[in-house]
């Protein structure tokens, strides 16, 4: 079982998000020896393991986005974003217009910007097919913004895998907002 959220007990095994490294770890049962008592009977397929981890990381990112939205800290859509100046962060979809993005950034001046998130993932959080922009609002009441830090970490994990398929994430997996 992959500990994507980092909450399971024990030492576990860590493998970098590189399919070649995963293949090497799986070769000869090296990974199975560290993860299972029944190493001789356990067959691990590197491609399946990597795709499964990528999917789980993608789900975790969608869940973080949904949680921010439910907390009222994720503003979706360009028109709504423009009404909330000085966001902590700006999320730009992979199909967003470069001209509109530059205009939005110059007007809002967010602290950080994440480019290239799938438009379908952002849209699903908003109960739409796709969405070009979302902004993260600061939590003024908290000295440390744990939810935003978690989102940034989840985006970094998702980028490391690069093969995630966010379009397969839907309400049946529990990542749908509201």
Predicted regions, residues:
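Local sequence-structure signature of Cys/Sec-based thiol-disulfide redox active-site neighborhoods
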Residues: 88-95
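Nucleotide-binding motor/catalytic cores of P-loop/tubulin-like NTPases across gene-expression machines
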Residues: 98-104, 119-124
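Charge-patterned, long linear interaction tracts outside catalytic cores
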Residues: 166-178
């Amino acid at each position: 079982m992959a500990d994507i959220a980092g909450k399971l007990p024990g030492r576990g095994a860590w493998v970098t998000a590189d399919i070649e490294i995963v293949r090497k770890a799986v070769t000869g049962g090296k990974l199975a020896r560290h993860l299972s008592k029944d190493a001789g009977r356990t067959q691990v397929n590197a491609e399946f393991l990597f795709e499964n981890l990528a999917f789980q990381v993608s789900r975790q990112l969608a869940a973080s986005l949904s949680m921010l939205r439910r907390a009222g800290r994720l503003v979706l859509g360009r028109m709504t974003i423009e009404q909330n100046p000085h966001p902590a962060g700006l999320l730009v979809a992979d199909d967003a217009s470069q001209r509109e993005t530059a205009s939005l950034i110059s007007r809002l001046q967010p602290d950080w910007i994440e480019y290239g998130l799938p438009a379908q993932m952002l849209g699903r959080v908003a109960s739409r097919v796709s969405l070009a922009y979302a902004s993260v609002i600061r939590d003024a009441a908290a000295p440390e913004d744990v939810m935003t830090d978690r989102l940034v970490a989840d985006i970094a994990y998702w980028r490391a895998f690069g093969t995630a398929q966010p379009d397969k994430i839907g309400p049946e997996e529990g990542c749908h907002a509201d």
